[in-house]
Structure formats: structure tokens, C-alpha cells
Amino acid sequence: MQEDKSNATEWIMDTGCTSHMTGDRSLLMEQTLRPPTKDHIVFADKSSRKVLGLGRVAISRDRHMENVILVESLGYNLMSISMLCDLDMLVIFGKF
């Protein structure tokens, strides 16, 4: 995965992503991260990045995502569709 130097504030809904991920520490609600469950994330292109910890991210005033992985030098925010479906959330795709 190529590094994107932009400070992304939008989330990409990813059907191939198994966890919510960000590279932006400022998005996490906690000052102290929870310990990661794995050391590295391997992407589809076989590149890998170091996992720095886990936290929560607010997506609105009253909603947040749990167990968001903070990934070193990740220039994207990835929202896992499979994690949303595991929470019985309905995800609908369509044309604009």
C-alpha cells in the first residue's frame, strides 16, 4: 500500500479490510492506546506496516467505532464493512 501524505479526515469503506484502521493518532478519543493484538498489518499488495495500538474514533456526536487500529504511516482511514455487518449494521451501496 502506498503512503498518502495527506492528512485524511474522510473514511474509505473497504470490503476487503478486516478491521477499522487509521494512521492519524489525533482521530483517536483516548490519550492512551490499548495494546495491539498483532504487531503488523499485511495489505493486499503484501506490504506491511507496524501496528501502534487500538482505540476508539468518534464518527458523530453519539456514535463511535471501537477497536480502531492505529497503523504507522497509514495515509488513509479504512472502515471495515465486515466489522459493520458483524454489528448487524446495514450497508447499502448504490449509484450517485
Write out the residue ranges for each language-model feature:
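Anionic group-binding determinants
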Residues: 1-96
